[in-house]
Amino acid sequence: MSKEPDRLFAQPLAQVPDFAFNEDVVRVFPDMIKRSVPGYPTIVENLGVLAAQFAQPNSVLYDLGSSLGAVTQALRRHVRTDGCRVIAVDNSAAMVERCREYLNGQDSMFQELLPVQVIEGDILALEFQPASVVALNFTLQFIAPEQRLALLGRIRQSLLPGGALILSEKLRFNDDQEHALLTDLHIAFKRANGYSELEIAQKRSAIENVMKPDSLEEHRERLLAAGFSKVVPWFQCLNFASLIALP
């Protein structure tokens, strides 16, 4: 993957545009997400491990909002269930193009990986096939809040008995003191990873209108309303968490 450092917000901008997954972001995305999301490598690799426990023969594994395909690669590293295939979906043409390049590279290094199809498209319009695993890895937070329940309901309808949705998200907290503390600790994490105060402030300004986090309680209530029977948090680092939702 690209080793280009994230310097997108290093210089003062007269007007900070809304964050978008364009070619500029794609170029630096691996560095950006590693330095911005505490626990990201652990979540991604273990998502593959978890998926291997739920994958069922002759079913689809979905990576929704696949970006550069890190989750898809983890699924292919860990899942060995007969007849499974991965469908990765993202609405950014730049992300999809680079994702395909990285997956071709994975194919050249390893044999007997799950077949994969990468689709450029809107996950809200996707016609789901019977699935045993669906991954939403830091994707739902970019979906309009009023559209989230319907999407989760459609995912629930597509899941086979014994399957799972694995949902990773940035969290907000209903307790003001808890929210302030974890926000400050997240900023400290970014400082420790080399981001300046200017970069942190401009990135926050760029993303606050396009990313709308929910609380853990909101996630749980929505997943149950969508028809899931059980919601199990399996990972949290600061204000980032991952959940398993069972049909």
UniProtKB/Swiss-Prot annotation:
Biological process annotations from GO: tRNA wobble uridine modification
InterPro entries the record matches: CmoA (IPR005271), Methyltransf_25 (IPR041698), SAM-dependent_MTases_sf (IPR029063)
Pfam name, any one: Methyltransf_25
Protein name: Carboxy-S-adenosyl-L-methionine synthase
Enzyme class label: transferase
Function: Catalyzes the conversion of S-adenosyl-L-methionine (SAM) to carboxy-S-adenosyl-L-methionine (Cx-SAM).
GO terms assigned for molecular function: carboxyl- or carbamoyltransferase activity; S-adenosyl-L-methionine binding
Keywords: S-adenosyl-L-methionine, Transferase
HAMAP family: Cx_SAM_synthase
Self-association and partners: Homodimer.
Keyword S-adenosyl-L-methionine among record annotations: yes
Chain residues that bind S-adenosyl-L-methionine: 40, 65-67, 90-91, 122-123, 137, 204
EC number(s) stated in the UniProt entry for this protein: 2.1.3.-
Catalytic activity: prephenate + S-adenosyl-L-methionine = carboxy-S-adenosyl-L-methionine + 3-phenylpyruvate + H2O
Domain of life: Bacteria
Protein family per UniProt: Belongs to the class I-like SAM-binding methyltransferase superfamily. Cx-SAM synthase family.
